[in-house]
């Protein structure tokens, strides 16, 4: 449909003093009823639309009089003139094209298509008129790309013509909200704002700081774990020495006799002081006493298994020997306890003195170790003679009852 011809026809209708139906304008209303496209502004065809609406309502009443029966009790009865004035008042108050313009044009061009009674027709028109949302001509929508409409409400861009068409239908209607567009190509933060370069740089710095903080932490953990391992390595030899000492106490007689000679030779080779040699002699004495105790226990067991026949004077001699051996054992135990205490104190002193005497010349150390070695070799011989004599006496006592049998 030609827009220029339409605008000329509308101007001619406004100039006429007597309002009459125009075929061109009726064709325009039919076009809107079919397509919903309004090619001109509301101010231009508002007069003809009101004229056509009033004429259709009057014609509908004359052709279809009011029903003779009683009105519907569930619906409020409103006289025709009152309803007509209400509808015309609402339409004249429009500042823009109502979004129901297509349905209204259908009612104007073909009023009897869906309605037969006048009251129902007026209620249908009133229902489509009582709206506030508005639309704009399709020509403006095609020409201005910045105009956006959602549910009949236009969200403007930067169009200069929007200020003239800012009002919508009805009193107290809120103005459309001007919402800025945000491009989705840029990354969004948690609060909906675009992520800036400063934020990216700060995040990169934070990640780098975390990496640097993690690396020293791992180094410190390694440093902490290494001294713990060193402590365990230092404690292991001490525990091993303790186990070796316990093992030596429970060895057999031959191993107990060979151990003093090996310990003396190792001490001479290492250049230990007098305190270490005295402690080794005390250990030798302890081992000899342990061997003597083992012999005594074996003799007691043999005596317990002897027959009652030999319970005569030989038993008395054996009891005397055992009493003397027990007295010797008690005295030797006391001496061993005292010597062990002295040896521990001497070991502590030697550990302190050995740290301070690390700078002594090697020649003096060798001379002292040779003298102490000779002294140490004499002392085990003397100590070893005493348990040997005790063991010989014990074997003689054990052999006498065997001869009597």
Curated annotation (Swiss-Prot):
Single Gene Ontology MF annotation: protein phosphatase regulator activity
GO CC field: cytoplasm; nucleus; protein phosphatase 4 complex
Compositionally skewed regions (Polar residues) per UniProt: 140-149, 160-170, 183-194, 215-228
Biased composition (Acidic residues): 330-341, 390-405
Stretch list, region Disordered: 140-405
Cited InterPro entries: PPP4R2
Biased segments, Basic and acidic residues type: 196-214, 231-258, 312-323, 344-353
Biased composition (Low complexity): 354-366, 377-389
Job of this protein: Regulatory subunit of serine/threonine-protein phosphatase 4 (PP4).
Subunit and partners: Serine/threonine-protein phosphatase 4 (PP4) occurs in different assemblies of the catalytic and one or more regulatory subunits.
Similarity field: Belongs to the PPP4R2 family.
Name this polypeptide is given: Serine/threonine-protein phosphatase 4 regulatory subunit 2
Gene: PPP4R2
């Amino acid at each position: 449909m030609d827009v220029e011809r339409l605008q000329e026809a509308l101007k001619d209708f406004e100039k006429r003093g007597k309002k009459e139906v125009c075929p061109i304008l009726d064709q325009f209303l039919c076009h809107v009823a079919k397509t919903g496209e309004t090619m001109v502004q509301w101010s231009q065809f508002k007069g003809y639309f009101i004229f056509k609406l009033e004429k259709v309502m009057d014609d509908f009443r004359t052709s279809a009089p009011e029903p003779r029966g009683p009105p519907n009790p569930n619906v409020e009865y409103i006289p025709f003139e009152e309803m007509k004035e209400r509808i015309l008042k609402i339409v004249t108050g429009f500042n823009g094209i109502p979004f129901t313009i297509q349905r209204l044009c259908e009612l104007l061009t073909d009023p009897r298509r869906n309605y037969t009674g006048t009251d129902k027709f007026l209620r249908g028109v009133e229902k489509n008129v009582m709206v506030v949302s508005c639309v704009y001509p399709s020509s403006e929508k095609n020409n201005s790309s910045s105009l956006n409409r959602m549910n009949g409400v236009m969200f403007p861009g930067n169009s200069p013509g929007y200020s003239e068409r800012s009002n919508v239908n009805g009193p107290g209607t809120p103005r459309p909200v001007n919402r800025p567009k945000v491009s989705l190509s840029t990354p969004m933060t948690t609060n909906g704002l675009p992520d800036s370069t400063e934020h990216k740089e700060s995040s990169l710095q934070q990640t780098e700081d975390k990496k640097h903080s993690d690396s020293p932490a791992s180094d410190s953990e390694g440093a902490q774990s290494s001294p713990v391992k060193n402590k365990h390595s230092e404690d292991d030899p001490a525990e091993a020495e303790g186990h070796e000492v316990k093992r030596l106490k429970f060895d057999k007689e031959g191993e107990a006799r060979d151990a003093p000679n090996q310990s003396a030779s190792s001490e001479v080779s290492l250049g230990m002081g007098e305190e270490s040699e005295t402690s080794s002699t005390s250990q030798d004495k302890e081992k000899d006493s342990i061997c003597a105790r083992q012999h005594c226990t074996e003799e007691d067991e043999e005596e317990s298994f002897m027959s009652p026949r030999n319970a005569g004077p030989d038993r008395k001699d054996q009891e005397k020997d055992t009493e003397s051996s027990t007295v010797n054992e008690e005295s030797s135990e006391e001496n061993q306890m005292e010597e062990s205490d002295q040896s521990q104190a001497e070991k502590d002193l030697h550990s302190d003195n050995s740290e301070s005497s690390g700078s002594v010349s090697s020649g003096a150390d060798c001379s002292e170790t040779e003298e102490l070695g000779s002294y140490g070799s004499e002392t085990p011989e003397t100590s070893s003679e005493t348990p040997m004599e005790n063991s010989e006496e014990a074997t003689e006592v054990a052999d006498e009852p065997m001869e009597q049998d």
